[in-house]
From Swiss-Prot:
Domain notes per entry: Consists of three domains: the N-terminal catalytic domain, the anticodon-binding domain and the C-terminal extension.
PROSITE patterns: AA_TRNA_LIGASE_II
Name assigned to this protein: Proline--tRNA ligase
Organism for this UniProt entry: Amoebophilus asiaticus (strain 5a2)
The protein's Enzyme Commission number: 6.1.1.15
Database matches in HAMAP family: Pro_tRNA_synth_type3 (MF_01571)
Presence of the UniProt keyword Nucleotide-binding in the record: yes
Oligomer and partners: Homodimer.
Annotated gene: proS
Catalytic activity: tRNA(Pro) + L-proline + ATP = L-prolyl-tRNA(Pro) + AMP + diphosphate
Record NCBIfam families: proS_fam_I
Superkingdom of the organism of origin: Bacteria
């Protein structure tokens, strides 16, 4: 039988790690800080990729691929950018190994030292803007809307599967525009695409906002963010979109002739989402029984489990199960038939519950005789007997209902764990006893932001775009505040 999971209440961190391993999403790799994404976990990422890629292309973006290696001199061109990533950069210094004299080992060949060291891509602004210099001459070349699907390396010291690893997968968009207004509009458009993706596919209510100057992306004029609240009350930054101004254009001399015939620098944006979203799915929706997946990104939306005692029953039920599976697939429903004999139905029920499959279908002798099936929802464990001639309509409706329920549940959790405070004492009590999102006034200074973090471990998650902007006084200094910001303890 399946070993029982630790509960969320007992140890949230262990519960999270065990779900990822036992549901076969990922595992720690031989290289410290790296992970191996297993086929089931990668299938979720592929679903996310397909949905996002379609949305990007619908808004005029094209995919390209740029080198993983970046000359160190490129990073020096944008001082704020390099400062933000310097401590996380992996550096290539040599290009060849050689065998030792006894032939027992390989060592770095000292004669193969690179003239210029190469940085393993932590993000691609510098290498991409170097290309844009050659691609853009006139306003007719704008806007330039490019996306890249790739891996990046950031040498994290404290790692956690999906949430923070030395290497991870992501998409990074990089665009160039003729005007400031167009670039700002692009950054907000991509933020909204991310937020809609969260609601419509991940069933996660993302809070949209602006990062403070202290939390802003290195080299950006403005960073927009989507923040999610996990079941342990911690915040998770799920994606960001940056208005870069003309910083990278000036650093890499990316100019264009505008419609007035004058030479000007282009305006830029960059934006990205990562495999961290799989971690967000786990922590937002899953329960003490295992993974719970939103249907629209689930690799298997429905699993069919035949139940039989005799060979005669097996053949008839398998035939019916195969027929239903083919019907479901024909209607774009991802259906798996588990006809393995080495495991009993009860074992299979537990297996697919652990793996978060949205719907389980059981077909036994009585179902065959009555032309029915039994459907069980993963989110509520509710069982329903359904006539087979109505199966497509019912399954489609149930998948939508599961998505809506997961979203509503996550939204209500966020609302119930969002607190408004008016004093620093209230703030400290809320952050230590309740966690969640804390709405509080802040005076707008980095110093106050740092002091609050030092004393409570809480950071400003964002200046919200969708919350009442009434002025007040800072909870820490008593100085004037333009609006409440969202604090939280974060991953």
């Amino acid at each position: 039988m399946h070993k029982k999971l630790p509960t969320r209440a007992e140890n949230f961190s262990e519960w999270y790690n065990e779900i990822i391993k036992r549901a076969e999403l990922a595992e720690n790799a031989a290289v410290r800080g790296c992970m191996t994404i297993r086929p089931y976990g990668f299938a979720i990422w592929e679903k996310m990729q397909a949905i996002l890629d379609k949305a990007f292309k619908a808004t005029g973006h094209e995919n390209a691929y740029f080198p993983i290696f970046i000359p160190k001199s490129y990073l020096n061109r944008e001082a704020a950018h390099v400062e933000g990533f310097a401590k996380e950069c992996a550096v290539v210094t040599h290009y060849r190994l050689k065998a030792t004299e006894d032939g027992q080992q390989v060592v770095v060949d000292p004669s193969a030292k690179l003239e210029e060291e190469l940085i393993v891509r932590p993000t691609s602004e510098t290498i991409i803007w170097n290309s844009y210099k050659n691609w853009i001459q006139s306003y007719r070349d704008l806007p330039l809307l490019i996306n890249q699907w790739c891996n990046v390396v950031r040498w994290e010291m404290r790692t956690r599967l999906f949430l923070r690893t030395a290497e991870f997968l992501w998409q990074e968009g990089h665009t160039a525009h003729a005007t400031q207004a167009e670039a700002e509009q692009e950054a907000l458009q991509m933020l909204n695409i991310y937020a809609d993706f969260g609601k419509d596919y991940l069933a996660i209510p993302f809070l949209k906002g602006i990062k403070t100057e202290h939390e802003r992306f290195a080299g950006a004029e403005e960073t927009y963010t989507i923040e999610a609240l996990m079941q342990d009350g911690k915040a998770l930054q799920a994606g960001t979109s940056h208005f870069l101004g003309q910083r990278f254009a000036k650093a890499f001399e990316v100019t264009f002739t505008n419609q007035a015939g004058q030479l000007d620098y282009v305006w830029g944006t960059s934006w990205g989402l990562t495999t961290r979203l799989i971690g967000a799915l786990v922590m937002t929706h899953s329960d003490d029984k295992g993974l719970v997946l939103p249907p629209r990104v689930a690799p298997i939306q429905i699993v069919i489990i035949p139940i039989y005692r005799t060979q005669e029953e097996k053949e008839a039920i398998q035939q019916q199960a195969q027929h239903i599976q083919q019907q479901l697939i024909a209607h774009n429903i991802s259906a798996k038939l588990d006809g393995r004999d080495e495991h009993k139905p009860g074992w299979k029920f537990a297996e697919y519950e652990l793996k978060g499959v949205p719907i389980r279908m059981a077909i036994g002798p009585n179902d065959l005789a009555n032309n029915t099936v039994e459907l069980t929802r993963r989110d509520t464990s509710e069982k329903t007997t359904v006539p087979t001639d109505n199966i497509i309509v019912v399954v489609k409706s149930m998948l939508d209902s599961i998505h809506d329920n997961l979203y509503q549940r996550a939204y209500e959790f966020r609302e119930q764990n969002t607190y408004q405070v008016n004093s620093y004492e209230e703030f400290k009590t809320a952050i230590s006893q309740k966690r969640g999102f804390i709405l509080a006034h802040w005076d707008g200074t980095k110093e106050t932001e740092r002091q609050i973090h030092a004393e409570t471990k809480a950071t400003i998650r964002c200046i919200p775009l969708e919350v009442n902007t009434e002025p007040g006084v800072c909870i820490y200094t008593g100085k004037p505040s333009k609006q409440r910001v969202v604090f939280g303890q974060a991953y």
